[in-house]
Amino acid sequence: MLDTDIFSYASKGTNQEVFRRLSLVSVGDVYISVIVNAEIEFGIMSSPKPERDRERSLILLQHITVLDFPREAVHDYGLIRSDLQRRGQLIGANDMLIAAHARYLGLTLVTNNIREFSRIPGLTLENWAE
């Protein structure tokens, strides 16, 4: 499951390693959360060139499956948020939702934000930007 930053690198072509790694994965094995999709839409709407960014995103989205957030994943979200809050290590609300989604489905989260996501027990991470 790609995080927003990795999707952004791929759609903009700003990181060759991300592009290389994506080319090695079967099309049916690349996912984003609907939460990431919402963040992508926000980025497009906030962009000085929204038409260009929408076109780039749509091209990439043709090869990626967008996964709806399952009702059952709210339990993982509650566990993640309460644990991080108890430890005084909260991360962004959308990041906690994305983490809960990936962890619930047993998917590896591909992100360049290892520092924050590594605070979440049981979440498998990879960084394709390095």
Language model region names:
Residues 1-32, 44-59, 86:
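Short, well-structured N-terminal submotif of metal-dependent ribonuclease cores
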Residues 3-4, 18, 40, 77, ...:
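Generic structural signal for small/hydrophobic residues in well-ordered secondary structure
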Residues 6, 36, 73, 98, ...:
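Alpha-helix capping/helix-boundary segments
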Residues 32, 36, 43-48, 67, ...:
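Short catalytic/metal-binding and nucleic-acid-binding patches
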Residues 65-110:
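Active-site neighborhoods of divalent-metal-dependent phosphate/nucleic-acid chemistry enzymes
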Residues 99, 103-130:
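Acidic, PIN/NYN-like endoribonuclease modules and their adjacent C-terminal/linker elements
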